[in-house]
C-alpha cells in the first residue's frame, strides 16, 4: 500500500495533468471554432464544383469521341495510382490519425492484390512516422500543410500528380482524409479525383457544342481548379476534424483525471485515518502499560 507521502505526490501530479488537459481542450475548442468557420465558407463551393464536374463528365458522353481529355476517360487497365493521405502533424487526438492510416493500409492491400503500383504521398507527420516505422515506402512527404492549409501549396502538390496523370505515368489520383461531420463525429473519406466518373444516366441532356482547342482548354482549366480545390478542402476538413477529435480526447482525459483524483483522495483519507487510528492505539497501549 502506498504511503501518505506517495499518495499526496500522485494527487498533485494528476491535478497538474488535469490542468494541462483542460487547457488543451480550451485551445482545441477555440481552434475548432475557426476551423468550422473555414469549412462553412468552403463547403458549399466544394460541393458545387464537385457536382458541376460530374455533370460535365456525364454530358460529355455526346462528344467524348472528339474530346481527348484523359480526365474524363474511362481507364480500363489501371497500372499505377497516386494515393494522397492527410493526417495531423501532432497526436493527442484519440483515434483521428490511426483511422486514416488503417484505411490507407486497407486501400494499399486492395490495390496490391490487383497488381497496381502505388505512389504514396503523405501529408502529416504522424502518418509519415508510422509508415517509416512499418517500412511502407513513401513517394513524397509533406509536413506543416495539414496544420496550416494553404491553397497554393495544395495546388502545387496536386499539379505534379495531374501532370503525371495527363502524361499517362499514373492512372488514378485518390485522396484519403478523416473529415469533420460534427463536434462529436469524424469520418474517413476515400475519394477518386481522377479520372472523373462518367455516368450517362446522370444527365438527360447532352452538350450541343462543336469541340475545338478552346473548348478543351476551358475544360482542362476547370479540371485543374477542381482537383486543386478538392485537395485544399480535404485539408480544411481534416484540420477541423483533428481539432474536434483533440477536444474530445482532452475532455475525456480531464474527466478521467478528475475521477482519479477523487479515488486517490479517498485512498489518501483512508490511509490517513488508519494512521491516526494506529497512533491512538499505540498511545492507549503505552498508557495502559504504564499503569501496570
From Swiss-Prot:
Gene3D superfamilies, A to Z: 3.40.1380.10, ATP synthase, gamma subunit, helix hairpin domain (1.10.287.80)
Keyword Chloroplast: no
GO molecular function, one term: ATP binding
Topological category with respect to the lipid bilayer: Peripheral membrane protein
Source taxon at top rank: Bacteria
Pfam families (UniProt xref): ATP-synt
Keywords: ATP synthesis, Cell inner membrane, Cell membrane, CF(1), Hydrogen ion transport, Ion transport, Membrane, Transport
Cross-referenced InterPro entries: ATP_synth_F1_ATPase_gsu (IPR035968), ATP_synth_F1_gsu (IPR000131)
Swiss-Prot/TrEMBL GO biological process terms: proton motive force-driven plasma membrane ATP synthesis
Alphabetical list of SUPFAM superfamilies matching this protein: ATP synthase (F1-ATPase), gamma subunit
Subunit structure: F-type ATPases have 2 components, CF(1) - the catalytic core - and CF(0) - the membrane proton channel. CF(1) has five subunits: alpha(3), beta(3), gamma(1), delta(1), epsilon(1). CF(0) has three main subunits: a, b and c.
Family in the record: Belongs to the ATPase gamma chain family.
Name recorded for this polypeptide: ATP synthase gamma chain
Primary gene name: atpG
Amino acid at each position: 500500500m502506498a504511503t501518505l507521502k506517495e499518495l499526496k505526490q500522485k494527487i498533485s501530479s494528476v491535478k497538474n495533468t488535469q490542468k494541462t488537459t483542460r487547457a488543451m481542450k480550451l485551445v482545441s475548442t477555440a481552434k475548432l471554432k475557426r476551423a468550422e468557420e473555414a469549412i462553412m465558407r468552403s463547403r458549399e463551393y466544394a460541393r458545387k464544383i464537385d457536382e458541376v464536374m460530374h455533370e460535365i463528365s456525364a454530358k460529355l458522353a455526346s462528344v467524348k469521341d472528339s474530346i481527348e481529355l484523359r480526365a474524363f476517360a474511362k481507364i480500363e487497365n489501371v497500372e499505377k495510382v497516386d494515393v494522397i493521405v492527410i493526417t495531423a502533424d501532432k497526436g493527442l487526438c484519440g483515434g483521428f490519425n490511426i483511422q486514416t492510416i488503417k484505411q490507407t493500409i486497407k486501400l494499399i492491400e486492395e490495390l496490391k492484390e490487383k497488381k497496381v503500383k502505388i505512389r504514396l504521398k503523405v501529408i502529416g507527420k504522424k502518418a509519415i512516422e508510422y509508415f517509416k516505422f512499418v517500412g511502407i515506402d513513401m513517394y513524397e512527404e509533406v509536413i506543416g500543410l495539414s496544420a496550416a492549409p494553404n491553397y497554393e501549396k495544395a495546388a502545387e502538390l496536386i499539379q505534379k500528380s495531374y501532370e503525371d496523370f495527363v502524361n499517362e505515368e499514373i492512372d488514378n489520383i485518390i485522396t484519403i482524409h478523416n473529415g469533420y461531420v460534427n463536434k462529436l463525429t469524424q469520418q474517413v473519406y476515400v475519394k477518386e479525383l481522377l479520372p472523373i466518373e462518367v455516368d450517362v444516366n446522370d444527365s438527360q441532356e447532352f452538350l450541343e457544342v462543336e469541340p475545338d482547342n478552346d473548348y478543351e482548354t476551358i475544360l482542362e482549366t476547370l479540371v485543374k481548379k477542381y482537383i486543386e480545390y478538392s485537395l485544399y478542402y480535404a485539408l480544411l476538413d481534416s484540420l477541423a476534424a483533428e481539432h474536434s477529435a483533440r477536444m474530445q480526447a482532452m475532455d475525456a482525459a480531464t474527466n478521467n483525471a478528475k475521477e482519479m483524483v477523487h479515488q486517490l483522495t479517498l485512498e489518501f483519507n483512508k490511509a490517513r485515518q488508519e494512521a491516526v487510528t494506529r497512533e491512538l492505539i499505540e498511545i492507549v497501549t503505552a498508557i495502559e502499560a504504564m499503569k501496570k
